[in-house]
Amino acid sequence: ELLNTYFSRNIDGIILYLIYDETRAVQSLLEQEERRVPVVIVGRRINVDSFSNVATDNYLAGVMAGEYLGSIGHKRVATVTGPRITQWARDRLDGFRDGLAKYQAQLEWQYSQTDLPDFETGLAACDALMADYAGRALPTAIWAQNDIIAAAVLKSLTNQGYRVPEDISLLGMDDIQLCTMVTPMLSTIHQPLREIAQESIRIIMENEPG
């Protein structure tokens, strides 16, 4: 419905970011294809000839996260992933497992979101982690596939008396400004978000209808 509203306003282009239901979004866009409005999908790759994709290599991001945690000695690791129905979340998780495997580290615990990543998801993930490990030693590190989720996990751990990184290490994803605004500051995997935005706008401007 939202896409139909945008099209009705004679827009020059559409940039879609953080698509949750990829199948439904693609179908809605294809139904409006005759309007010849340029469409840019940000953050994941969707193989439709009339769409442009601007995305980083999500598999490589996962590998980098796994290799980093493995290289500093972590053997028992947890992660909070995006919704399993999304390709980007699956790619990051596959890469993460492969990166850990290079250091004989184990992905011991996984929390898959059922909705878009946000602060509440991070709190829910940490609650689930604590429930699953009640009376047992926690994994030594957590990779949150979003800095907002990482900040929520940090808050939950701190509230429960755990120290980051002394008791448990925490790694985020995206490298947004929030990482420097929390205590302690978050380690994170960098995403070139400014460059992604600039490239998306460039594509729209070059392909907007006459």
Predicted segment positions?
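Hinge/beta->alpha junction and helix N-cap segments in small-molecule ligand-binding domains
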Residues: 1, 19-20, 44, 53-64, ...
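Alpha-helical recognition/docking segments in bacterial nutrient-uptake
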Residues: 1-67, 71, 131
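Short acidic/polar active-site loop segments enriched in Thr and Asp
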Residues: 12, 74-76, 140
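Anion (oxyanion) recognition and catalysis
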Residues: 31-34, 101, 158
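Flexible loop/turn connectors
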Residues: 127-210
